[in-house]
A protein has these predicted regions:
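Aromatic-lined, polymer-binding surfaces characteristic
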Residues: 3, 9-298
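Extended polysaccharide-engagement surfaces of secreted carbohydrate-active enzymes
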Residues: 247, 254-411
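Short, well-ordered helical secondary-structure segments
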Residues: 5, 40, 178, 357-359, ...
Length: 411
C-alpha cells in the first residue's frame, strides 16, 4: 500500500473498517456479492481484501520497526480489522477460483502480521491476553494456512495438504506456483509443524529436477527444467524464463534457510545435473543482453537497454551457496559463466560446440538454434507437442501469438 502506517491507522473506524474501502465493501454486500462464485467478482474481492490486509501489515510492521507504540499498533480497532476482513476471506465460497489473493497475498500478509506481534501471539497461544487478541491469533493462523490449502484441488489432497501428492501434477501446486509465491516455510514455522517442514524440504529437493515429453507422467513436476536444457511453465508452455527459474530458485532459497537445521539437505547429483543443464541450455535463448521473443508470459517484450539473463540471480545463489555440490570442473564452469553473465556476453568459447555455442535442437520445445559470436538464428518449429505461452488477463499478454506454430527469428 502507498499509505503510511499512520495514515492506515487514521483510516480505521472503531469497528475495524478502513474508510477508503467502505464503499467498495457496501457494493459487494449488495445481492450477497461475497458469496458469488464467479471468477470476475471473486477476483475483485481478492484485491479488495489484499488492500485491507496490506494496510494492517503496514501497521504491524511499523510496530516491529519501533515506529508505532504497542497501544496504537495493537489497539482494539486494529484487532477488529483483522477479524472483520479475515471473516470475509474465510467465508468466501470454494466452488469458484480462490487464487492469487487467497493463496499468495493474504497468507503472506497474515504470517508477517503474526511475526510482527510475535510476543503477543505466543502469549495468546497459551491462553494469555484478552479474548479479542486470542481470536486474532487464531484468525492469522487460519489465514496463513491458506498458503497450504488454497485453491482447492478437489481431490484427495484437500483432506491432507501436508502430502507429496499435494505438490505434484497440478499447475497451481508445482514450480513457481508451489514454492515461489506461497509463504510455505513461514507458515510451517508459525504452526511449529515438523511434518510441514519435513515435506517442504523434500519437495524443494525433488523439485530441482527435469521433465520431458517422454517422462511427463513420471517426472516429479510437470513443468520446470526440461531434459534438453530448456524449460516449461504451466505444463508444456514454452516458458523458458519465469516459472522454471522461479520454482528452482525458490527451492534453493528455502534450502538455504534450512542449512544448519535438522532439515539441512545437500544437493544430490541429479539436482546438480538439472541445474547445470538448464544454465547451459538457457544461455541459447539469450543473446548479447537481450532475451529472445516468445519465451515468457510477454511474447514480444522489447527492452531498449541490455539486461542480464533472467537466471543471473539464481546463478549467483548457486555459486555463493551451493558450489560444493558440483565437481571441480563444473565449479570452474559455473564461475566462468558467472563472469560472462555479468558482462551480458555469454560465449564460453573454451567449451565444445553444442554446449554454449554452435547448433542445438531443443527437442522438448521443438526449437532449432544456431548461435555464434556474430549472429543468432532461432527456428521455432510448428509443434503440436507444446502449448504456446501464458495469456492470462492482467498479468500476461491477454492474447497468444501461437509461438509454436512455426516462425524463424534472426538476430
Amino acid at each position: 500500500t502507498s499509505y503510511s502506517a499512520k495514515e492506515c491507522l487514521e483510516q480505521l473506524t472503531d469497528n475495524g473498517i478502513f474508510t477508503p474501502l467502505q464503499t467498495q465493501e457496501d457494493e459487494f454486500r449488495k445481492d450477497n456479492g461475497f458469496q458469488k462464485p464467479y471468477s470476475t467478482v471473486q477476483g475483485e474481492i481478492g484485491l479488495f481484501l489484499t488492500d485491507a490486509f496490506n494496510c494492517i501489515w503496514k501497521i504491524a510492521d511499523a510496530y516491529r520497526k519501533k515506529e508505532l507504540p504497542l497501544e496504537k499498533a495493537l489497539s482494539d480497532k486494529v484487532l477488529k480489522a483483522i477479524l472483520h476482513y479475515g471473516n470475509i476471506e474465510l467465508g468466501r465460497p470454494n466452488d469458484g477460483p480462490r487464487f492469487h489473493a487467497s493463496c499468495f497475498a493474504i497468507p503472506t500478509a497474515a504470517v508477517n502480521i503474526y511475526y510482527a506481534y510475535l510476543a503477543q501471539m505466543e502469549g495468546a497461544e497459551i491462553g494469555q491476553g484478552r479474548a479479542l487478541l486470542r481470536g486474532v491469533c487464531d484468525m492469522l493462523k487460519a489465514l496463513g494456512l491458506q498458503a497450504w490449502t488454497q485453491p482447492l484441488r478437489h481431490d484427495e489432497t484437500d483432506e491432507n495438504v501436508v502430502s507429496i501428492s499435494r505438490f505434484r501434477n497440478h499447475v497451481w501446486w508445482v514450480g513457481g506456483n508451489a514454492l515461489a509465491y506461497r509463504s510455505l516455510l513461514p507458515v510451517a514455522a508459525m504452526y511449529r509443524s515438523i511434518p510441514m517442514i519435513d515435506l517442504l524440504a523434500e519437495v524443494c529437493q525433488r523439485g530441482i529436477s527435469m521433465t520431458s515429453q517422454n517422462t511427463y507422467s513420471e517426472a516429479f513436476w510437470t513443468e520446470g527444467f526440461t531434459a534438453d536444457g530448456a524449460g516449461w511453465g504451466h505444463g508444456k508452455q514454452c516458458l523458458i524464463w519465469g516459472y522454471p527459474i522461479d520454482g528452482t530458485s525458490n527451492a534453493l532459497s528455502i534450502l538455504n534457510l534450512l542449512k544448519g537445521t535438522p532439515w539441512s539437505k545437500a544437493l544430490n547429483r541429479d539436482n546438480a545435473e538439472a541445474i547445470l543443464n538448464f544454465l547451459r541450455g538457457g544461455s541459447w535463448y539469450y543473446y548479447k543482453g537481450y532475451r529472445l521473443p516468445c519465451l515468457d508470459r510477454g511474447s514480444y517484450v522489447y527492452n531498449p537497454m541490455e539486461q542480464s539473463i533472467p537466471y543471473a540471480k539464481m546463478l549467483d545463489n548457486i555459486v555463493t551457496n551451493w558450489i560444493d555440490s558440483f565437481t571441480p570442473e563444473e565449479q570452474k564452469e559455473l564461475q566462468q559463466l558467472q563472469v560472462e553473465v555479468k558482462k551480458n556476453r555469454i560465449n564460453m568459447n573454451n567449451y565444445v560446440l553444442g554446449v554454449y555455442n554452435g547448433t542445438r535442437w531443443f527437442f522438448n520445445n521443438d526449437d532449432l538454434i544456431k548461435k555464434t559470436s556474430d549472429y543468432h538464428i532461432t527456428v521455432n518449429m510448428a509443434s503440436v507437442r507444446c502449448d504456446g505461452l501464458e495469456s492470462a488477463v492482467n498479468m500476461a499478454d491477454e492474447y497468444n501469438f501461437y509461438p509454436t506454430d512455426g516462425l524463424t527469428l534472426f538476430q
